[in-house]
Amino acid sequence: INERKNEFINIVLPIIVDQNRKIIVLRQRLIDSKNYLNQNKTLSQTDQVFIKNLATKYSVTTKNRHKIDIINDLLISIDIIPNSIVLAQAANESGWGSSRFATEFNALFGEYTYDINNGIIPARREEGKKHLVKYFKTIDKSVESYFININTHFAYDKFRKLRKIIRDKNNSFNNVDLLVDKLDAYAVNDEYVDIIISIIHDNELTQYDNILSLLTIS
């Protein structure tokens, strides 16, 4: 890997790892709450508020639903995204951090918005189109927004469902290609999935997937 790519990985990977670590902490608290409920115990007010706030953030319906069902839905959305996938998507969208959006606006993932207060007009936007590229104060905020996007947007429902199947089956995301295949809606380019898979393997990004044993939580 050349110097620019190395520098990009050195800057972005710790932020990705931090996001996944936060998700692991949330998952464990949800699992603990679920186990508590399964013993027919009542959750503390703090835990109830915690679950309600997460449900709002991750667009999970709570009205007239048992808390265990709410937690089960949250566990589908609140799960890690393998480091290699996040790195590859960021590298692809930002030209390994060299794009104008990345250098001037901390926008690594090319996320769209229609909010004029949070976006800039892309240079090659087609006439009549109104989308903007979301900008961020820090790279951390860009990565955080990407995680929320993948973990909540309906376009990535297939990704989340497969991730749950893998999680339930063997708790290991060793074959990231399977997950990348479910991110075809991320871009209009029909070859997008193949491009991301190539970036992962050509740059041996899966070597970063086991950092901090991120993939061992139940």
Predicted segments with their positions:
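Catalytic cores of secreted/periplasmic lytic hydrolases that degrade extracellular macromolecules
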Residues: 1-88, 92-218
